Amino acid sequence: MPIASSISSGPAPEPGFGSQIKALADGFAAEPAWANYLQAREAVLRMMDDWARLGPEEGPSTYWRQEMGGFDYLFDASPLVIGRLREHCHHLTGVKSFDYRPHHAHLKADFVRKYGVLLAAGGEDLFVPEPLALGGFGFDVGPGLANIDTLKFFEVLIGLRKAGALQDFQAPDGPRRTVVEIGGGWGGFAHQFKTLCPNSAYVCVDLPPTLLFSIVYLKTLFPEARTLVYGEPGFEAKLGEMEPYDFVFLPPWRLPRMEQARIDLAINMVSFQEMTTAQVEGYASVLRALGCPALYSLNRDRSKHNAELSTVSEALGRHYQLTQIEVLDEPYTQIAERKRPRELAVTGYRHLFGRA
C-alpha cells in the first residue's frame, strides 16, 4: 500500500495547539463579551481624555498612573483575554484564580466554614455565587462557587440587611430605587446586588481605567440590562431620567452634577481607607448635598500605611450620623478559623452605616 494512501485512510490527526488556541479565540470573538469590550474601550478612552484635561487635583494621580501601568495591556486585549476577564481582576482586588485551582483544594474547607459563619449571621437568602462567565472561579461551598470577593460582598449584604437598608430595594412592587457604589471595581458587588434587587438602578462610580472592567462584566452578565455610560451620545439628557436604567457608569468628577437624580443609598468597600481625609470627606459632602439619605462603608478606619487619612469614621461622621453594624467578629479577609478572634483596632475593618 502506498504511504500516502495509508496515511489518508487513518483517523484524522488532532489539531495542533496553535489551531486549538485560534479556535478558542475565534469562539470568544463571536461572544457578546467581545462586542461589549470594544464599545467599553472606546467609552473609557474618551473618559481618559477628559480625565487628562482636568486640573492636577482632579486628574490622574501619580499613584493611579502607576496602578494603571499594571493593566494598560487591557486597552489592547484579544478576545481570548476578554473571555477570561476575571483572571485579570486581581489588579483591582488582589484575588487570583491561582489560589482556587485543584492543587489548593485543601483550602476549600476554610471557605465552606466561612460561608457557614455568614449564613449563621443572617444571610440565608442573600448568597449569590460567583458566576462561571468570563472565567469566574472559586471553591464550591454548596450552592455555588465562592472566593474572598464573593464572601466579602455576601458579608456586606448581610450588614445592609442588619442596618435596615436592603429591604426597600428588595420590594418587587415598590418604587424603583437608586444605589451609588463609590469604587465599584470589576462589578462583582453590583452583580450580587442587582441579582437580589432587580428593581433598582445601580450607579458605578470609579476611575476610568477601572470602569473598563465593570462595564464589560456587567453588560455581559446582564445582556438585557439598560445601561448608560458617561460620554455616550445624549448622555447628559439621559442622566436626568436615570430610573429607566439598570446600570449607569460614571467617573468621579461627574458625580457632583447628579442634582436631578434621586439617590437612595451609597456604598463603599475598602477604598475610602486608601484615600486622603479630604477625598473621603469630599465624597460624603457630595452625597449629602445630592440628598442621599444613607451611606454604607466597609473599610479599615485607616490603612496602616496611609498617613494622609485621619480615620474614615471621622471624615464620614462630619456629614452622616454613623452606627457600627456588627456582622462578624472576624475580618472578611480571615477565611481559616482562629482560636482567638483578632482585636479590632483602628486598622481593623468596620461596617459603618450612616444616616443623614
Where are these regions (language model features)?
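Rossmann-like AdoMet/SAM-dependent catalytic core
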Residues: I3-P79, P252, E314-A356
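Conserved Class I S-adenosyl-L-methionine-dependent methyltransferase catalytic core
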Residues: D49-P172
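Conserved SAM-dependent methyltransferase scaffold
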Residues: L157, A190-H191, L211
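Conserved class I S-adenosyl-L-methionine
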Residues: D173-G185
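Conserved SAM-binding loop of SAM-dependent methyltransferases across substrates and taxa
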Residues: W186-C197
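S-adenosyl-L-methionine
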Residues: Y217-E259
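A short, conserved alpha-helix within the catalytic core of class I
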Residues: E274-L287
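Conserved beta-strand signature within the Rossmann-like core of class I S-adenosyl-L-methionine
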Residues: A289-R302
